[in-house]
Amino acid sequence: MKKIKKAIIPAAGLGTRFLPATKAMPKEMLPILDKPTIQYIVEEASKAGIEDIIIVTGKHKRAIEDHFDNQKELEMVLENKGKADLLEKVQYSTDLANIFYVRQKEQKGLGHAIHTAKQFIGNEPFAVLLGDDIVESDTPAIKQLMDVYEETGHSVIGVQEVPESDTHRYGVIDPSAKEGSRYEVRQFVEKPKQGTAPSNLAIMGRYVLTPEIFDYLETQQEGAGNEIQLTDAIERMNSKQQVYAYDFEGNRYDVGEKLGFVKTTIEYALKDPEMSQDLKAFIKQLDI
């Protein structure tokens, strides 16, 4: 069985929920404290043992490439000024993994974005990490899925429970047999109408997929939102080869919408030893 060494991070979306901030800045570069959101995703992949990452980008996304590239002039300035701690942080972001880029020329959905990276992946199993979900866990969320793949040899989709009132916002599974946190799946449903979801186990932006998924993506018809949905292709593949769902451990932060982004920023700031006390004092004086 081939080890998983490659990952895809889709980052071609327009970020309309954050306009006008994202008119010229990629949504993925919006910072949680002092790091852009996409760096948290790359760090998770790197900690899981991923060596090669392809980021699927679009127009006006060059800042992502610049962030993970060397910037010798900046490094020289920091070194000359004796700012070793900042120098280490800057160099760290460039050494996380081998990072490559491909453009999604049309906005045709997540499934289309994944298919755009087919040549990079080749005939290997691979991971997918979506940038809207930051997960804090002792074992990286994607590594938990990779471990299930190594046990079973089958594709694995990361899920977590959500309130029933929110199921229409996600892809949702209809689980059958369960072993620990691993589920066999009868059906994958993309954004079910409110009140019709088969469970409250929602797909949460982490996948380990076998290369056969590309065969299904190539012939996948448009689905929800008139886009090529990855969930629909996974559902078709599941009818031919078992696809598992895994309820991974960890705290998930939704940074794909404004309220979740603000909540994440506050929670991370409250954990930061340099600012937590001052922030707590500030919040207290707001008298809310």
Swiss-Prot record:
Pathway in which the depicted protein is active: Glycolipid metabolism; diglucosyl-diacylglycerol biosynthesis
Domain of life: Bacteria
CDD domains noted in UniProt: UGPase_prokaryotic (cd02541)
GO terms, biological process: enterobacterial common antigen biosynthetic process; UDP-alpha-D-glucose metabolic process
EC number: 2.7.7.9
Pfam family of the protein (one): NTP_transferase
Keywords linked to the UniProt accession: Carbohydrate metabolism, Nucleotidyltransferase, Transferase
SUPFAM superfamilies in alphabetical order: Nucleotide-diphospho-sugar transferases
Molecular-function GO term, any one: UTP:glucose-1-phosphate uridylyltransferase activity
Major enzyme class: transferase
Reactions the enzyme catalyzes: alpha-D-glucose 1-phosphate + UTP + H(+) = UDP-alpha-D-glucose + diphosphate
Cysteine pairings via disulfide bonds: none
Reported function: Catalyzes the formation of UDP-glucose from glucose-1-phosphate and UTP. This is an intermediate step in the biosynthesis of diglucosyl-diacylglycerol (Glc2-DAG), i.e. a glycolipid found in the membrane, which is also used as a membrane anchor for lipoteichoic acid (LTA).
Family: Belongs to the UDPGP type 2 family.
Protein's name in the database: UTP--glucose-1-phosphate uridylyltransferase
Organism: Staphylococcus epidermidis (strain ATCC 35984 / DSM 28319 / BCRC 17069 / CCUG 31568 / BM 3577 / RP62A)
The gene coding this protein: gtaB
